[in-house]
């Protein structure tokens, strides 16, 4: 699928508009073979689904059928055998993970699984402190584990680049099992690790799903460990709830069938009563919907879990899921909520500062944006990744933000756009970096403050070679053009079959041209409500945080929209509603 030229090139927000061109022959073939509605099939074609079997599978994910065999991960048999041996011989096992949602859910999945197999008194969990230890497995953690008598270390969401730590563990007689999903570096996976479970690199060459989150890799290990357990299916189904949270929060590809099945099944489980006091308390405090959706995970549950590692210590998350009583769980969930409120405040302060800089430089922005400052200046390490995402959304440019500490070291996060592979970009400046790692669209790095300007210049030189000017800036691409009479409650419910939405499977975006504009109202001086249509076909269209565009709409008789379809449920009555992403006056 490719974007087509449009008369409207930009909306009033400044975003560039595109309309996807659909293969009409493939569309008609699918329509005949599946009997599905055209608008649904257009969306599926836009997500790369052009065969009937794939379409049917996508629309009806099956948890057990869509999970790949864990033994397709090359080192799975060795990992399983070693962990079973450790439990049999009463050897201590240390689980070390990242401090984000993917890492903390992985920790809970692995610890619960190993405890079910008889390792209750053998398992310890360790999460590095973001501010004093930084990201990843370190030599200090390995040495400490050796001194405390651990004979096995299992990592999750970290470790794929820990070559030195793998060598150290081997030297100290510790067997290191790595569960990760990040890209290995040029050396491939750590050769001296006892086992590496990763869908990327040589260890995952036969694994079909290259977009598995670390919690997904942890679930695969649980699958294999529990292969002979009489309650395996029920346990794996329960663990899928945490896997769904980690998968959505880590923003992996939800068009991938295995991820889709995990999230769909996990969300169903989350919508049912839980026997875990911590999960119950977290869901209650997060005020999630019924049923729970990826939006609830991404914007309510996930941020509260993430907040602990961003502003304090992620151990609070592990304590929550280990809580034995509702009273204890409620206190711990409230603590996460307070952490999240603090995170929101420091994030707001930093974003306001960065938005001002962007606005001042809007006519001369670099291809790649790099911001740096001290914590006293508002550059708090815990919110850099979120701030990057917001600036990318605002500018449509790869963005890196780093916080400089008192020793002159800058720790940073990066987020990207299509066409700019972050790891390859960081590879191009690796000689000025202390360390780095991540994915094509998200990465982390450490650099000496004195090297930041050199890094900025070289990243932009690299960007000039791989990014055209036309690829920069915010772009909105519609799945299809829609008329007002098709934007019904029934159509919206039909499109809900595309859920769960996320990376790789975004909520459908539609172009609606030259709609009669009846009125524009301000809501709480922040948002806009547009009344659109004629006579009996009036429909409400809401545009959040768009009050600044009210003057541009004043006096207009017609408006074109980039929008999403929604249902407004009130007093047992359902009405259609539009969520505006951008608008244009032709």
Label for each model-derived stretch:
Residues 451-456, 524, 549-550, 557-586:
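OB-fold single-stranded nucleic acid-binding module
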Residues 536-552:
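Beta-strand/loop nucleic-acid-binding surfaces
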Residues 476-539:
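Accessory interdomain/linker segments of ATP-dependent helicases and helicase-like nucleic-acid enzymes
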Residues 2-21:
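N-terminal amphipathic/basic leader segments beginning at the initiator methionine
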Residues 140-215, 219-228, 234, 238:
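Active-site cavity-forming subdomains of large catalytic enzyme subunits
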Residues 12, 20-24, 30-151, 172-173, ...:
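Hydrophobic helix-and-loop "lid/oligomerization" segment in the mid-to-C-terminal part
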Residues 437, 495, 514, 556-567:
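OB-fold and OB-like beta-barrel modules that bind single-stranded nucleic acids
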Residues 430-435, 461-468:
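A common structural junction motif
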């Amino acid at each position: 699928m490719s974007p087509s030229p449009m008369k409207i090139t930009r909306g009033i927000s400044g975003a560039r508009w595109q309309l996807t061109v659909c293969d009409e022959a493939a569309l008609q073939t699918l329509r005949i073979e599946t009997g599905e509605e055209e608008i649904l099939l257009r969306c599926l074609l836009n997500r790369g689904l052009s065969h009937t079997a794939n379409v049917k599978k996508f629309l009806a994910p099956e948890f057990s059928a869509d999970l790949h065999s864990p033994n397709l991960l090359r080192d799975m048999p060795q990992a399983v055998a070693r962990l079973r041996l450790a439990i049999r011989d009463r050897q201590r096992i240390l689980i070390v993970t990242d401090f984000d949602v993917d890492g903390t859910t992985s920790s809970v999945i692995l610890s619960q699984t190993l405890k079910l197999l008889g390792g209750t008194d053998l398992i310890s969990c360790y999460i590095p402190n973001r501010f004093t230890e930084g990201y990843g497995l370190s030599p200090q953690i390995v040495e400490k584990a050796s001194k405390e008598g651990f004979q096995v270390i299992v990592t999750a969401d970290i470790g794929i680049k820990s070559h030195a730590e793998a060598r150290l563990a081997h030297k100290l007689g510790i067997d290191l099992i790595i569960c990760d999903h990040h890209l290995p570096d040029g050396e491939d996976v750590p050769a001296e690790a006892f086992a590496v479970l990763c869908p990327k690199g040589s260890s995952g060459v036969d694994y079909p799903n290259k977009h598995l989150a670390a919690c997904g890799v942890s679930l695969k290990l649980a699958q294999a460990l529990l292969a002979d357990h009489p309650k395996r299916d029920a346990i794996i189904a329960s663990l899928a709830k945490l896997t769904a949270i980690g998968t959505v929060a880590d923003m992996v590809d939800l068009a991938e069938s295995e991820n889709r099945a995990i999230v769909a099944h996990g969300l169903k489980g989350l919508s049912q009563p839980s026997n875990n006091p911590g999960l119950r308390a977290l869901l209650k405090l997060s005020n999630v919907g019924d049923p729970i959706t990826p939006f609830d995970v991404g914007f309510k549950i996930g941020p509260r879990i993430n907040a602990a590692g961003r502003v304090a210590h992620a151990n609070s998350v592990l304590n929550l899921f280990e809580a034995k009583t509702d009273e204890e769980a409620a206190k711990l969930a409230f603590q996460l909520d307070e952490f999240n409120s603090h995170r929101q405040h420091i994030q707001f302060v930093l974003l306001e500062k960065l938005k001002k800089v962007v606005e001042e430089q809007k006519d001369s922005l670099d291809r790649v944006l790099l911001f740096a400052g001290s914590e006293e200046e508002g550059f708090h390490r815990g919110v850099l990744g979120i701030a990057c995402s917001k600036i990318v959304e605002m500018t449509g440019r790869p963005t890196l933000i780093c916080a400089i500490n008192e020793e002159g070291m800058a720790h940073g996060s990066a987020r990207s756009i299509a066409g700019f592979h972050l790891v390859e970009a960081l590879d191009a400046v690796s000689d000025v970096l202390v360390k780095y790692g991540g994915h094509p669209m998200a990465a982390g790095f450490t650099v000496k403050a004195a090297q930041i300007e050199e890094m900025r210049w070289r990243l932009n030189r690299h960007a000039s070679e791989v990014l055209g000017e036309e690829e920069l800036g915010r772009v909105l691409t519609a799945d299809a053009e829609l008329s007002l009479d098709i934007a019904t409650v029934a159509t919206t419910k039909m499109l809900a079959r595309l859920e769960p939405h996320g990376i790789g499977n975004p909520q459908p975006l539609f172009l609606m041209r030259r709609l009669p504009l009846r009125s524009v109202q301000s809501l709480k001086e922040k948002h806009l409500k547009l009344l659109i249509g004629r006579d009996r076909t009036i429909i409400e269209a809401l545009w959040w945080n768009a009050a600044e565009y009210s003057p541009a709409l004043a006096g207009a008789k017609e408006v074109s929209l980039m929008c999403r379809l929604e249902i407004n449920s009130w007093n047992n009555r359902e009405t259609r509603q539009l969520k505006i992403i951008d608008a244009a006056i032709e």
